[in-house]
Each structure stands twice: as structure tokens, then as C-alpha cells.
Design a protein with these regions (language model features):
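Short clusters of small/polar residues that mark proteolytic maturation junctions
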Residues: 261-262
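Hydrophobic positions on the alpha1 helix immediately C-terminal to the Walker A/P-loop
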Residues: 74
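The conserved Walker
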Residues: 66-67
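Active-site pocket-lining segment
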Residues: 288-308, 317
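Flexible phosphate-sensing "switch/lid" loops adjacent to ATP/NTP-binding sites
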Residues: 1-63, 78-230, 234-237, 245, ...
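Long C-terminal interaction/binding lobes of large macromolecular proteins
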Residues: 284
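A short, polar/charged loop-to-alpha-helix boundary motif
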Residues: 265-281
Length: 372
């Protein structure tokens, strides 16, 4: 479904790709006055203008690239068209966050706001649910704002809406699955801080606005957090201050902090990576996993033939060099076998890393943040 459809060269090129692959597609259009003008929305001049999506199953899952993509609008449009064809259809949504039956200011729900800071989503008490049941539940602004449209759609189609509130229409049992609230709170707090660091870097890259940063700062303040509450960030900053050069730190699953500093041979992320593998493998810190004579030819290749100005090895080059060393060195082989243990570890760099380093660490499952 191509939502908010307008014919442009890029859209037409995308449609041609879909045609070439035999993928059916449908157009949904902008509706003037959406979402306030309910009488127009739920009419042939509103949803009626959209293409009818042909389906052959009794249960259809609507998914999309991300928030604000038009999932709910697609469902409501389809309800309108199904009814016109004499088919009685219903709608429910599965959405994990915010969690409706925990506190509005629980770190998990604040983390959801942090995750959607670019959309400016705001968690709020569901006023419809409170009025209907006298029960306080948590929802968010977009669902609360669209509920009158959903209710009017059901009222017009079936004469009655089966839902009395946005919370009613959701399927979410996540809150009942929490058995260690302190662990959940800590994980949520770390997510809030990660979102802040990532947004700061995205701002430098031109991918985030000042308003997004301001909102994340406010959320951190409301949660009683600061950047030093991220242990690896604190340690990386201390090492940079001590050495006067970029530094990195990683918190292993058992809580051990391992650091890495910039040298003539390795960038801070590469040094930290090797040091972490040593710790996990129980190898002494003074053992060299990669001989300097292995690193030197790689540096010469980078500078003399590939046009690089920085001779230091990135993480991908470091892992390739470690793999070569592992052929004849049992300790290097042992260290290489520890890579899977880095998954879900928290890492921070005191500077923004090159994209290649970010990609490697992401593939390893490391939760990276950077200062900028």
C-alpha cells in the first residue's frame, strides 16, 4: 500500500519495480481535514477514494516500515471498503509500547517516548478509558487523537463501535510478563541514555533536529538520569581525558569494564575489541594477539594504495588480521572464538566512529553509543 500517494518520478520508479516482481500494490490518498473532518473521512470522498485491497484470508496482518506509516489508516480504510462489499470486518492492534497497565512514568514507558522522540509521541492517560471504566491506563497521543475517527468509522458502518477506548482496541500482555521490575527499569534507563547519545550523533549527521535533542534531555531529566549513568561512557571519557586521545570502553555481560585507547597501530575501538576478547578468553593483557609485522603491511596497503590517510586498523581489518593470526596461533584462535560473547554488551566511544566500525559492532550485536 502506497500511502499519501502522489505520482512522482521516484514513486513511479518504485511502482515499476513492484510490477517487475509481480507484487500487487494499491494507492491510498491524502484526505483533506484528516483526522478532524470525520464526516468526510468516512465517506466516498475520504476512504472511498482509496483502492480496495483484495484479500483471501479471514485474518490479515498489517505491518509497515515503522511508526507513522499508515497502518491504522489502512485498516480503517479497509473496514469501509469491506462493508461496502457486504463483508463484516473488525480491527484490533498489537502494539507493545507504551505498556498500558504500568505507571505512566515507568522507565519502560519513558523509554518508548525516547524511542519515538523524532515523532514527538507523548505518553498520556487514556481519557476515553478513564471515562468509560473509571480505570487509569496508559496510551499515547496519536492513538488517543485518532480514536474518534475509528469510533465514527465503526458507528457509520455497523451502528456501534465495539471499543470504548484506544486501550480497548489493543492486544498487549507485556506488562503481565514483567517478573523482575528492577532489571526492567535498569534496561529501560540504559535505552533512554542510548537514544540520547544516538540522537546527538544523528544531529551532527543532519538526521535529527534540536527539538528531538531537547525532548530527550527532558526525558532523561524526568527519569533522573545523566550520561554518567552509562558505565562504559563514563570509563571511555575518563580514559580519553587521561590519554588525550580517543578511547572506548565496553561492559561485558558479567559487568566487567574493558577499555581501549588509540595507538599508532589500532583505533580505540579495535584496541578495545582485542582487549575484550583477551579478557573473555583468559589471556594475559601483555600477550600480542596480532604481531606488528602482520599489521604493518595492512597499513601500507591502506596508505600507499587505497588512499587512506589514517593508518590505524578499523575493527573489520583488525578481525581479519586476527583471523590470519589464528591459523598458526592458538591464543589468537581462542580469542577469535569469543566473538559471540560480545552480543548484547554495552559499548561507548569517546568520539564518533567510522561507519565501517559501526557496521561491524552492529553485526556483533554490541550496543554502541558515541560522544560527539
Amino acid at each position: 500500500v502506497l500511502t499519501k500517494y502522489v505520482s512522482t518520478p521516484r514513486v513511479n520508479a518504485f511502482e515499476q519495480k513492484l510490477k517487475d516482481r509481480g507484487i500487487p500494490f494499491y494507492h491510498h490518498y491524502l484526505i483533506d481535514g484528516y483526522p478532524a473532518n470525520i464526516s468526510k473521512i468516512v465517506s466516498d470522498e475520504g476512504y472511498g477514494k482509496n483502492d480496495y485491497i483484495k484479500t483471501n484470508r479471514s485474518l490479515v496482518v498489517i505491518t509497515a516500515p515503522g511508526p507513522g506509516s499508515g497502518k491504522m489508516a489502512t485498516c480503517l480504510s479497509q473496514l469501509y471498503h469491506e462493508n461496502k462489499r457486504g463483508i463484516k470486518a473488525g480491527y484490533a492492534k498489537f502494539e507493545t509500547f507504551p505498556i498500558w497497565n504500568i505507571a505512566l512514568k515507568h522507565p519502560v514507558n519513558i523509554a518508548y517516548e525516547a524511542a519515538t522522540a523524532d515523532l514527538n509521541d507523548v505518553n498520556m492517560i487514556d481519557p476515553w478509558h478513564l471515562e468509560a471504566y473509571g480505570e487509569t491506563t496508559v496510551n499515547y497521543n496519536r492513538d488517543v487523537e485518532i480514536f474518534p475517527v475509528l469510533k465514527a468509522t465503526f458507528d457509520k458502518i455497523y451502528g456501534k463501535c465495539p471499543y470504548k477506548s484506544p486501550t480497548d482496541m489493543g492486544v498487549n500482555m507485556a506488562g503481565n510478563c514483567i517478573f523482575d521490575d528492577e532489571a526492567v527499569k535498569e534496561a529501560a534507563n540504559q535505552e533512554i541514555i542510548r537514544r540520547f547519545f544516538n540522537a546527538k550523533c544523528n544531529q551532527i549527521k543532519g538526521r535529527a533536529s534540536k527539538d528531538e535533542i531537547y525532548k530527550l534531555e527532558l526525558l532523561m531529566n524526568n527519569a533522573g538520569l545523566c550520561v554518567d549513568d552509562r558505565k562504559c561512557a563514563l570509563e571511555a571519557t575518563k580514559l580519553e581525558e587521561k590519554t588525550g586521545a580517543p578511547a572506548a570502553a565496553i561492559e561485558l555481560i558479567d559487568g566487567t569494564i574493558v577499555k581501549g585507547k588509540t595507538s599508532a597501530l589500532l583505533g580505540c575501538a579495535s584496541a578495545m575489541l582485542l582487549n575484550a576478547l583477551k579478557v573473555l578468553a583468559g589471556i594475559d593483557d601483555d600477550i600480542l594477539l596480532i604481531a606488528p609485522e602482520v599489521i604493518k603491511p595492512i597499513q601500507e596497503l591502506k596508505i600507499n594504495h587505497l588512499g587512506n590517510k589514517n593508518p590505524r586498523l578499523h575493527t573489520d581489518e583488525t578481525l581479519i588480521a586476527l583471523s590470519i593470526s589464528a591459523v598458526n596461533d592458538e591464543k589468537a584462535k581462542l580469542a577469535l572464538n569469543q566473538l559471540s560473547k560480545l552480543k548484547n554488551c554495552e559499548m561507548h566511544s569517546s568520539v564518533m566512529l567510522a561507519q565501517v566500525d559501526e557496521n561491524v559492532l552492529k553485526k556483533l550485536g554490541v550496543r554502541l553509543t558515541c560522544s560527539c
